[in-house]
Amino acid sequence: MVRNRFLANRKSAKTAFCKEFRTMAHYNTVFHTLAKILPRHEIDRFDRKYGQGDKRRQSSRYVQFIVMLMAQILDLKSLREIEQAQKSNQKRLYHLGVKSPVSRSALSRMNDERSADFFKDVFQQMLQSCKALAPGSQFKLPGVNSLILMDATTIQLCLDVFPWATYTQTKGALKLHFGLNDDGYLPDFMVATTGKVHEINVAKSLDYQPGSMICMDRGYTDYDWWEELTRKGIYFVTRLKSNAVYDEIRRRAGRRSKNIVDDETIKLKGIQTPFRLIHYISPEDQHEYHFITNAMHLPAQTIADIYKERWQIELFFKWVNQNQKIKIFLDTSANAVMT
């Protein structure tokens, strides 16, 4: 009886080990495949840009990037695990330019002291490469160059451990602000801030190309900003808050789909620029939505379809949460977290 239990436990342990080994082997294959297609010359260029004044004996930012990429893909949870994984994969890492393992103390110091802007530049460079291969947008909108789906997601942090990441008096958080391009569903921009920074403040600080269209939720309500976008030739689509005060200028003529209740030109209180307000009944739940936009030339149903497309950024956030392993941070400083 005891022997049978021992053999069963041994078999179970062996099965678990084999499963873990196969998983690690898969992650290693993914990591090395990805590492080989990195734009090494571009990363070296950014290394030279940010590396002025570095001590000569320090590892390059390319090495730091490869080690951190390995940690992310292999789901390593501590500096000690990263150090051990480098030793286990030393031959493979050598061929990727990591000549010797980076100690955990050295890696901690790099993440804490080296500007995270290096990784922002690498991200933007790789993003441009991905965009060249991305499929086109399903929306072919006259006069609109690109459709940007805008929103933000929050990562909760312990305020005692991350005192710089203020959110409320008792909570800490990191907020990621995204602008997802409908053309391939890749981000046009990503801005990381502390949790207390409101989405509208980040949105107003960004530059948008004339002819682009921003689709966003009611958290981005700012009448003056909407007016500024209109002056610059930038379109927007969002929902009007229920307490908004406005005057109807005229009802818009033209054919409407059966789900369009009304289509009117309005003036919001305190704003001279006229906007367009569309009243829409959703066929799915029969709920009435009120869309406001400055795109006067598009059919009302198209405006409703554009706002429906905003759901794609929610799916993007869900995908990030499922695939981006942000369970722990290797250090507590703001620069290390951004890295």
Question: Which residue stretches match the model-derived regions?
Answer:
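Single, function-defining residue in the core of a domain
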Residues: 2-81, 85, 112-114, 121-125, ...
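Acidic/polar active-site rim loop that often engages polyanionic ligands
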Residues: 87, 102, 106, 208
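Extended, structured, electrostatic nucleic-acid-contact surfaces
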Residues: 87-97
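Major-groove recognition helix of helix-turn-helix-like DNA-binding domains
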Residues: 95-114
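A glycine- and small-aliphatic-rich helix-loop capping segment at beta-alpha/alpha-beta transitions
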Residues: 165
